[in-house]
């Protein structure tokens, strides 16, 4: 029976590349986004054309009841989630003192609250099955912090701490929890950079360029395939930048 992989925030960018990478292996794929329904359906068509079965679920994974409905659909069609990839995330650029509380809540709820929600529903079956993989997409800003991205940095620091703590809790049940701390990746999240700003950033990165979404997807798949002894790790993927 094929394993089931859930990737949140997967209509574009890193999540999209991860979904396509797992689809190559003919896994059951569950893709999700908050409102880009058309993009999600296009991705579903690509995945099914590759021979993989797919559920496309449009909904806000920062909402607990929405995630509950998503897992009901998954359970009906595929059964339990074997691989949970928590990729949904948002950022906001600006001074901390100008950040409104509603925007703080939105960033925290999306970037860390969604992980609570999805883990809450995925973990019981993983424990029952004595196997499972949870991979959280984090950021180097969760390690060192970024000026003018305080809320995002705080949320990703929480992702890293959750990853390490949950890995210890679930290791006795043969469930591995790891995170990828991404550096500058060439996705829409960084599209606000001007050409001059992007060039200056590339000069700061020892590798001389931003990473690609496909490279992140390749690393995520390698983590999934890695020995079960690899758990609780925050793996930097930043071209030697930080």
What spans do the regions from the language model cover?
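Alpha-helical segment proximal to the catalytic Tyr-Lys
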Residues: 124, 168-172
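Short, small/polar-rich loop/turn modules that mediate ligand/substrate recognition or access, typified
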Residues: 171, 176, 230-232
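Substrate-binding pocket helix/loop in short-chain dehydrogenase/reductase
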Residues: 95-96, 103-108, 197, 201
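Active-site helix of classical SDR
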Residues: 119, 155
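Residue(s) in the substrate-gating loop at a strand-loop-helix junction
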Residues: 139
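C-terminal substrate-recognition "lid" of short-chain dehydrogenase/reductases
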Residues: 131, 209-237
